[in-house]
Each structure stands twice: as C-alpha cells, then as structure tokens.
C-alpha cells in the first residue's frame, strides 16, 4: 500500500510543472520562425516565396519583452510569363506587450511594434529583365517600422510555440510600402 501511495504521489508530482522559471525579468530567449508573405490577389503558398527569421528576446517587467530579429523574406513578382524575384534582408528591434493570458500563464496573446532597417534586392540586382525590358525599380536600403501580433503557447517551462502575424512598412521601397506576413516557430527561453 505504501508503494502504491508513493508511486501515485510521484506521478502527480512529475505531472504538475512548476512555473517558477517563466517570464522572469532579464530572462533571454532564442526564437526561430518560418512563414509566408501575404501578397494581395495571390495564393498564400507559392514556390520560392517564404520568410525565415531568428530572434533574440529579453523579458522585461510584467511579462512584456523586447526583441531583436534578423528576417529574410523572398517573394516572386509576376511579370509576363516569368517572375521577378524580390528579396529583403531586415533587422528589426521591437517591443511586445501581453494583451491576454490564461490563468495558468500557459497561453498569451501579444501585440507590439518594431523599427527596422535592411536591404531590398530586386531581380538579383539586374536591371534588365529576361525579355530585354529595363527594370525601373531598383535595389536599395530600406527602413521603417512594423506592427506585430502573436499567440505564444508554453509547451514546457522553457519551450514555446509561437504563431504570429506582422505588417511591415518599408519606406524607400520601390515595390510595396506595406508587407504583411504570417509565421510560426519555436522559442527557447534560457
């Protein structure tokens, strides 16, 4: 009987997780995400159209955090029977604030903003298109800001599943001023 009671206590103790190491001020994390840009009048999933990113996060007070992200986005712009590749390499620095959470602090909805700078490359830097036409838009340095919305789910005390959407405003771009995207990934809080 004692063995069964000790076994039951041990199973209950291991099934319950301690939340003492979550969302501590100055706690850092590393996040890796993949996603797709949302292009108006285009299918969501397209060949050679993707976004990847790596972020470093640092929790501040009251469950909010600051982040620094490096993002690479690739999409194809249709031109006749071919495509013109558009690539962006961006560095984002921002802040996320919790809007909602459950009572156990397992799921959060965050909203935030960021400032960004980067480089936009159009047609791999070539100014002549495959049919001989001259491309008037050009590759250049871009800057701007963004709005972010994310749902974060704790899978364990240090591992989170993150699903998010963002809208970036790229000033200086010849192609699009507003670039929405959706992404999903994982964060490890150290």
Where are these regions (language model features)?
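Outer-envelope beta-barrel architecture signal
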Residues: 22-30, 62-66, 105-111, 139-141, ...
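Residues that define the transmembrane beta-barrel architecture of outer-membrane proteins
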Residues: 26-28, 46-52, 85-91, 107, ...
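Extracellular loop and loop/strand-boundary signature of outer-membrane beta-barrel proteins
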Residues: 39-42, 77-84, 131-137, 168-173
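Short glycine/proline- and aromatic-enriched beta-strand/turn motifs that initiate or cap beta-hairpins
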Residues: 19-69, 183, 187-189
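Gram-negative (and chloroplast) outer-membrane scaffold detector with strong preference
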Residues: 55-130, 159, 188-190
């Amino acid at each position: 009987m004692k063995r069964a009671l000790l076994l039951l206590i041990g199973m209950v103790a291991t099934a319950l997780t301690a939340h003492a190491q979550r969302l501590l001020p100055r706690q850092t994390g590393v996040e890796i995400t993949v996603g797709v840009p949302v292009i108006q009048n285009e299918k969501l999933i397209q060949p050679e159209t993707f976004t990847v990113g790596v972020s470093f996060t640092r929790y501040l007070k009251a469950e909010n955090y600051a982040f620094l992200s490096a993002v690479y986005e690739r999409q194809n712009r249709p031109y006749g029977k071919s495509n013109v590749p558009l690539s962006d390499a961006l560095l984002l620095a921002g802040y996320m604030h919790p809007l909602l959470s459950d009572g156990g602090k397992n799921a959060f909805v965050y909203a935030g903003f960021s400032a960004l700078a980067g480089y936009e490359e159009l047609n791999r830097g070539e100014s002549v298109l495959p049919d001989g036409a001259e491309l008037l838009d050009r590759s250049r340095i871009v800057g701007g800001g963004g709005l972010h919305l994310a749902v974060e789910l704790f899978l364990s005390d240090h591992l989170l599943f993150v699903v998010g959407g963002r809208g970036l405003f790229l000033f200086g771009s010849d192609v699009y001023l507003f670039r929405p995207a959706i992404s999903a990934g994982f964060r490890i809080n150290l």
